[in-house]
Amino acid sequence: MDIKKLQDYQKHIRNFSIVAHIDHGKSTIADRILELTDTVSERQMKNQLLDDMPLERQRGITIKLNSVEVKYHAKDGETYIFHLIDTPGHVDFSYEVSRSLAACEGALLVVDATQGVQAQTLANTYLAIDDDLEILPVINKIDLPSADPEMCKNEIEEMIGLDASDAVEVSGKTGQGIPELLEEIVKKVPAPNGDLNAPLKALIFDSKYDDYRGVVLSVRIEEGTVKPGDRIRIMNTGKEFEVTEVGVSSPHPVKKDMLIAGDVGYLTANIKSVRETRVGDTITSAENPTEKPLPGYRQIPPMVYSGMYPVDNQKYDDLKEALQKLQLNDAALEFEPETSQALGFGFRCGFLGLLHMDVVQERLEQEFGMDLIMTAPSVDYHAIMNDGSTKLIDNPADLPDAGEYKEVQEPYVKAEVMVPNDFVGPVMELCQRKRGEFVTMDYLDKYRVNVIYNMPLAEIIYDFFDELKSSTKGYASLDYEITGYRATDLVKIDMLLNKEPIDALSFIAHREEAQNRARQMTTMLKKLIPRQNFEVDIQGAIGAKIISRATIKPYRKDVTWKIHTGDPDRRAKLLEKQRRGKKRMKAVGKVEVPQDAFMAVLKMNDDDIKGK
């Protein structure tokens, strides 16, 4: 191993991430960089090339971080190795951003020249500052008529505190400014400085399951080197494996003889079980281990919980295996087994938000062929029991009877809404309607305001974002963080079908809204549950008290069609027999409940509740 050659190679490595608010053009800039450096041919090139998950291409958003190695021939005559990591912009996937930043020395901060700094721009920049990265401001979409690069530079300086006087102005669409951006990356992003002679120390920042090779680990080598044949140890589990292949993504896998300190690539080692590694673990050499593991990642707790059940109960084990494989590729997903009287065996899953929940469901259906029933999402509540203990409630059906607890606490968030001046009124009205408490309002410039409210997370996770977008014509951006739990007057509403409680339809609501919400839920269920051969009574109840009711009339078969019109006794007998049969059927009949009904709570917006 020629150490001088390796050190020279290391000096030419540049590891950087692209961070921005959603839709500010990160993936388009990544496309232009790949094109300009001839990493992919014109024939292979397609929009959002690094968004290789079918779901990303369908939705037009980045969901997963993705890394690629690019060779760039700079103006100084040297060839540089860029490891570019594209990251998501949606608040639900900020965990993916924090993981990708840990593998870098620099970050391109992309700001849309027509929109300026937005909520997630700030959130992602603070993540990069926390990781002590070199930040390069980039103003994108300068080809648009409404672009205002100077306004963006002022905002970056005033709101973030970064010098943006030499921010690179680019157009991801036309490629304008991309050559200058590549030169700036060479000059400003520092080379990695890991010790090549030290014992191997590598961070697992992502992973996926391959049916032929087992677990494929995405790694950033911090110190030392690794090559096929080396024995490695996962420091968290103590498990040892022999490396079978190392390489980089360019953007398709390319095998290499060795990965060295500073490299970002992949590694396989016949790891067959998804439980043997975890994102954030440190890999070291089995023969010459390092003393201390890398700090890893702060585990982000789920914000939203939902029940997930296979339509066919025989597929329970298949769903468990699919969730384990998906968790390998989606470290923020959490799940544990649960049983529902209505739906059988399934899992209680924790997600970072509703978009994350939708994405997990769609990936399970598309990639693993699962047919699923999802229950309505809820947040986790704390029930303070009479004996002083705290019980975590992530399923509304588990909330004990009112006499067993002193109070119920729900999670609160600090919500920051960036909005143009013209829409401050509608935003404040929306926040107050959602039980928000006004904190402060900061004027960012002549045109925009940052409105801050304390709000219950339960109000945010349903349709707050959609209502915010519609009340501000799409101009508002939202960021929020959990601030703690507060005691609130909450009650559990059970939904009963023919006097049988359906645990998967239970939900928790504020007492003042309980009757309206229960009434709305019974109306929704009446619309969504198809008619049966027997009458279906739908009731909403708090404890033993029924607070709402609706009835689905049965189909009625004409049992009198054979009878002569002049035989009223016979007619009455047949109708009475039909009534008795329906009564018996109602007592033993199983009501068919469609998937839509389990998500009915999501369709209950405020206008419906107020009966407008």
UniProtKB/Swiss-Prot annotation:
Transmembrane segments: none
tr-type G domain boundaries: 11-193
GO BP: positive regulation of translation
Enzyme Commission numbers on file: 3.6.5.n1
Localization in the cell: Cell membrane
Any one cellular-component term (Gene Ontology): plasma membrane
Main location: membrane
Pfam families, alphabetized: EFG_C, GTP_EFTU, GTP_EFTU_D2, LepA_C
Molecular function per GO: GTP binding; GTPase activity; ribosome binding; translation elongation factor activity
Binding-site list for GTP: 23-28, 140-143
S-S bonds: none
Reaction catalysis annotation: GTP + H2O = GDP + phosphate + H(+)
InterPro entries for this protein: EF-4 (IPR006297), EFG_III/V (IPR035647), EFG_V-like (IPR000640), EFTu-like_2 (IPR004161), LepA_C_sf (IPR038363), LepA_CTD (IPR013842), LepA_IV (IPR035654), P-loop_NTPase (IPR027417)
Assigned protein family: Belongs to the TRAFAC class translation factor GTPase superfamily. Classic translation factor GTPase family. LepA subfamily.
The protein's role, per its UniProt record: Required for accurate and efficient protein synthesis under certain stress conditions. May act as a fidelity factor of the translation reaction, by catalyzing a one-codon backward translocation of tRNAs on improperly translocated ribosomes. Back-translocation proceeds from a post-translocation (POST) complex to a pre-translocation (PRE) complex, thus giving elongation factor G a second chance to translocate the tRNAs correctly. Binds to ribosomes in a GTP-dependent manner.
Protein name: Elongation factor 4
Organism of derivation: Lactobacillus gasseri (strain ATCC 33323 / DSM 20243 / BCRC 14619 / CIP 102991 / JCM 1131 / KCTC 3163 / NCIMB 11718 / NCTC 13722 / AM63)
